[in-house]
Amino acid sequence: MVSVISTFSPFPLPEPMRQALLQAESAANQGEVPVGAVVTFQGKIIAVAGNAMQPPFVDPTGHAEVRALRQAASVLGSSRLDQCDLWVTLEPCAMCAGAIATARIRRLYYGADDPKGGAVLSGVRLFFQPSCHHQPEIYNDLGSRRASELLRQFFKQKRK
């Protein structure tokens, strides 16, 4: 059974989500969709990443979540990240949700919902499928206001 806990709060954000938002801002400054991700292990940040899909990267898998998971696996020397938590500014897509399940992330914290491309509580709801082999604890709505604003600003600029 997957547990989903909405964490909307007017209180200060935890440091990992603040760092994820900084990564999202950095990605936007590089012309990338503003998404940032952080992996923590035993409460310490071990990996940070923003989206990196555009030149010079040209990587269709260059989503912040995948990049942060790769870094964390490298730091820990294992692809099994079952004692790690992932903090991301936007609801993960199907590809990223699959990577989260494969890495066996313990807890997923995310900011803004993504009704069009998300796959956690939107779309295919990957972790709720019988074929999903791992289901992290899910905490949504953490830093959603700032994450949503970054996305709105980015796409408003793109449409100009």
Give residue ranges: language-model regions.
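Immediate flanking context of iron-sulfur cluster ligation sites
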Residues: 78-90
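A short, polar/charged loop-to-alpha-helix boundary motif
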Residues: 54-66
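Short beta-strand scaffold segments in enzyme catalytic cores
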Residues: 35-43, 47
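Residues that line or immediately flank small-molecule/substrate-binding pockets and catalytic motifs
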Residues: 42, 88, 112
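Zinc-dependent deaminase
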Residues: 1-30, 92-160
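Short loop/turn microsegments at loop-to-beta-strand junctions
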Residues: 33-35, 84
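Glycine/small-residue-rich phosphate/adenosyl-binding loop
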Residues: 47-48, 65-74
